[in-house]
Amino acid sequence: MRHALGSARRAGAALVAALTWAALLAGCSSVGSGGLDLDRILGKPPAPEDAIRITPDDGGRDVRPGTRLRVQVPGGHLEKVRVTRSQDAQDYPVPGRISADGLTWKPDHERLALAARYTVDAVALDSHGRRSARHTTFTTLVPDERFIAYVTPENRSVVGTGMIVSLSFSREIADRAAVERAVHVTARPPVDVRPHWFGASRLDFRPQRYWKPGTEVSVELRLRDVQGAPGVYGLQYKRFGFTVGRSQVSLVDAAKHTMEVRRDGELLATVPVTAGAPKHPTYNGKMVVMDMLEVTRMNSRTVGFGGEYDIPDVPHAMKLTGSGTYLHGNYWAPDAPGRVNVSHGCVGLRDVKGGSSGTPAGWFFDRSLIGDVVEVVNSKDKTVAPDNGLGGWNLNWQEWTAGSAVD
């Protein structure tokens, strides 16, 4: 996982400024504990390392339906909790309530659904008034001898022109040809859409070039009773669709510290950015916005680094890769965008603590869609892998079509 870092807010004293800029070993991540203690440097009381506790654990799989879903804080209070359940590309809100003391959220109905993906977003204030956030996901148990596909994007969504239809299967698929034949992706106006397998449990679809704005895409899963592996059969028979919105493609030049935002081919704006520092450069290549969070927590320990940073309230965070590359607001290194690359692989835009629509980060967030393309050039790193997030646009058409299991 890779994420953007930063240093800290400025203080008047020269010593604090020196400590702050010495900490510019940026990085990104989401959810975790530990990290660079800038509040201690600035003389503020420390925040609890794990301010928001969510069970089941982030990334949990095959969670049993009797498991308790809880969001808790040891002090302060929960400000907002949003939980959704996704099944067959459809999102359903999970109703629940925060306790009178503000320390716990629990659902109205305790039993979890089978064969579903749950997403939890929580924001809390500690006893010193500092905001922190967590974003977690987990999937529940799929009955034995059955498999399902978790689908991207959501049903009835409006997406950017770089959206790739991605199916993540709950079981490894042995008969990939049979499963591939049972999935139908069509477009209006018509365009040739082809599949590509990444390993035994992921199947993606895309056209040769980015979708044209206004295209309506339909996905039909005819998986029920299809044998995906010996004795394991599909569970779904479902149709869903989405619409392609306007075209927005942004070009990040890591050497120039700029991002050109183009809407329908016309230059909308050139925005100053900070990319990965020399020791932790940003991936080159085409990446697609996978998720958008108004605020999230980023922590170095969740991306394989040490305790360099733990930023509880990163604003305007847009996920670009499965490994954790984000494009997000940066309030802790306000002089970096446009001048120097200081992150651990993310792309940072100038922002303020708490986020604001009047900043470059807020402006870009408000004008973006899941499915928009962000391309990075002139970074001293390799091209992002095509299975890292929705990175399939980094394969040419011949390479893409060679990934089909059907002759």
Question: What does each model-found stretch correspond to?
Answer:
Residues 124-126, 223-225, 265, 295, ...:
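Short, charged beta-turn/beta-strand-edge "cap" motif at the junction between a beta-strand
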Residues 61, 110-113, 157, 161, ...:
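Extracytoplasmic/periplasmic, Sec-exported soluble proteins
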Residues 161, 300-407:
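Exported/periplasmic cell-wall-interacting domains
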Residues 231-338:
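Gly/Pro-biased beta-strand-loop elements
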Residues 2-25, 29-246, 273, 404:
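Acidic, low-complexity Ser/Thr/Gly/Pro-rich repeat segments typical of extracellular/periplasmic
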Residues 53, 70-72, 119, 166-168, ...:
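Soluble periplasmic/extracytoplasmic beta-strand elements of cell-envelope proteins
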